């Protein structure tokens, strides 16, 4: 019982720290013009994972809060790697939007849960494997970041069999 209680306290502490870190960064960071393609490419290289395939259109600039966008993309990639092995990442610029898509080959999320996964502290346990390290904030924070930039985030079934997360950002 003591071990379980200790794990629960550690998980609660992790939840609070993640949320506080997110809350403090949203109020202090200013918009800047940056090369989102290069930023994302640098981020993905840090994962050092040969099972992440990239299709990145070069030289896409975006005016926004760079650190928050990195946090947003990291959260989605972390989720994809937690539940899947293969991850497919793409970024492209269309006429008025930047589209970022992250797909994985994991168990996916039931369509009935799509809206719920954006709720803070919500976790899906059925069929998603062990979620001990999950606090249920990753996609919630990603959604908040995207919406704060005037964008939208959508979930679908991935062609790889798992989840596809599509982020659309205006520019």
Question: Which role does the model predict for each range below?
Answer:
Residues 104:
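Acidic ATP/Mg2+-coordinating residue in the GHKL
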Residues 109-122:
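Short conserved segment of the HATPase_c
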Residues 138, 142:
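Short alpha-helical Gxxx[C/S/T] motif in the catalytic ATP-binding
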Residues 69-73:
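A residue-level detector for a conserved hydrophobic packing site
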Residues 53-67, 92-95:
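Conserved catalytic submotifs in the C-terminal HATPase_c
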């Amino acid at each position: 019982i003591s071990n379980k209680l200790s794990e629960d306290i550690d998980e609660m502490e992790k939840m609070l720290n993640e949320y506080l870190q997110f809350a403090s960064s949203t109020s202090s960071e200013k918009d800047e013009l940056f090369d989102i393609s290069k930023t994302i490419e640098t981020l993905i290289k840090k994962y050092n994972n040969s099972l992440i395939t990239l299709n990145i259109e070069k030289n896409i600039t975006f005016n926004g809060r760079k650190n928050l966008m990195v946090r947003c993309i990291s959260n989605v990639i972390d989720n994809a790697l937690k539940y899947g092995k293969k991850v497919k990442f793409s970024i492209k610029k269309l006429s008025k939007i930047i589209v970022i898509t992250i797909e994985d080959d994991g168990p996916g999320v039931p369509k009935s849960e799509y809206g719920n996964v954006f709720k803070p502290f919500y976790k899906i346990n059925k069929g998603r494997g062990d979620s001990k390290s999950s606090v249920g904030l990753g996609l919630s924070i990603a959604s908040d970041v995207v919406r704060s930039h005037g964008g939208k985030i959508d979930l679908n079934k991935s062609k790889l069999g798992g989840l596809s997360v599509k982020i659309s950002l205006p520019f």
